[in-house]
């Protein structure tokens, strides 16, 4: 209890809703997971008391960690980010990578060569007979955008205050100069709010899962916005078995899937 009171600056009551969900996020984006005896009301968790177990996760930003995959996730013609889903088990760097992608898209940065040693070559095959016109248009579009990620307005729904690490409404992490943040807001409601009020070109959310999240994603995509999202899983096979998400994947709304692991440390890109 003393540790929690210290982390919450003696205002533990202000974190009641977060604690009910099993965590609290403190200044700097650091998250403290809590466990103990749950108190139920009408079959739902009302509170956790006493809290007897803690798990502290320290947040840290890695500027530039998304540079290795940004060209793969960028449309070469428009410079826009593609609809992307980051897949990783806990503690494998998906939120860190998402945060840097948000910063990159918001500020706009030059892309890298498409060839990559991460998962093999991502070079487009050379145009064969009958494809000269299409190849020529692609070259012209690449020249037009100069291989850059175009700066775009980004709306972030930061339900657990881990992406932007807002303190008194101000992001403590660098999420770009064109980014608007809804802090401590449920994902599904937040996505709808951003579309209606902030006119984002890209919407970013962490750890999607529930049916409400997926319905909100459909709405956002149908409005013409791009999506950057993450989900827990070890592989594509894992997430295809998740209820609700499997049918969503069959709609082929995401253009890129990035699987992360920790084979060579957190944030290792296993497949794209």
Where are these regions (language model features)?
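Conserved P-loop NTPase nucleotide-binding/switch module
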Residues: 171-172, 198-257, 262
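P-loop NTPase switch/communication element
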Residues: 106-111, 146-187
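Conserved lysine of the Walker
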Residues: 94
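P-loop NTP-binding catalytic core
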Residues: 12-80
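Conserved P-loop NTPase
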Residues: 27, 41-49, 256-272
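The conserved Walker
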Residues: 90
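Hydrophobic positions on the alpha1 helix immediately C-terminal to the Walker A/P-loop
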Residues: 97, 101
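Hydrophobic anchor at the beta1->P-loop junction of P-loop NTPases
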Residues: 86
């Amino acid at each position: 209890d003393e540790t929690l009171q210290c982390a919450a600056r003696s205002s533990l009551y202000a974190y009641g809703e977060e604690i009910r969900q099993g965590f609290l996020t403190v200044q700097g984006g650091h998250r403290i997971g809590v466990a103990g005896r749950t108190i139920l009301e009408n079959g739902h968790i009302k509170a956790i008391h006493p809290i007897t177990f803690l798990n502290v996760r320290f947040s840290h930003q890695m500027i530039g960690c998304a540079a290795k995959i940004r060209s793969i996730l960028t449309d070469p013609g428009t410079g826009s980010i593609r609809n992307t889903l980051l897949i990783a088990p806990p503690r494998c760097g998906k939120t860190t990578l998402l945060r840097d992608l948000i910063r990159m898209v918001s500020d706009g940065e030059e892309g890298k060569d498409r060839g990559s040693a991460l998962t093999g070559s991502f070079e487009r095959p050379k145009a064969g007979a009958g494809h000269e016109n299409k190849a020529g248009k692609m070259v012209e579009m690449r020249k037009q955008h100069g291989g850059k990620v175009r700066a775009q307005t980004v709306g972030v729904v930061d339900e657990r205050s881990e992406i932007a690490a807002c303190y008194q409404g101000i992001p403590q992490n660098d999420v770009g100069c064109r980014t608007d943040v809804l802090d401590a807001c449920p994902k599904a409601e937040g996505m709808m709010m951003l579309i209606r009020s902030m006119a984002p070109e890209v919407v970013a959310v962490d750890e999607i899962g529930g049916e409400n999240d997926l319905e909100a994603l459909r709405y956002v995509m149908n409005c013409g916005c791009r999506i950057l999202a993450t989900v827990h899983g070890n592989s594509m096979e894992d997430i295809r078995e998740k209820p609700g998400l499997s049918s969503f994947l069959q709609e082929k709304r995401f253009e890129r899937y990035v699987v992360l692991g920790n084979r060579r440390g957190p944030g290792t890109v296993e497949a794209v």
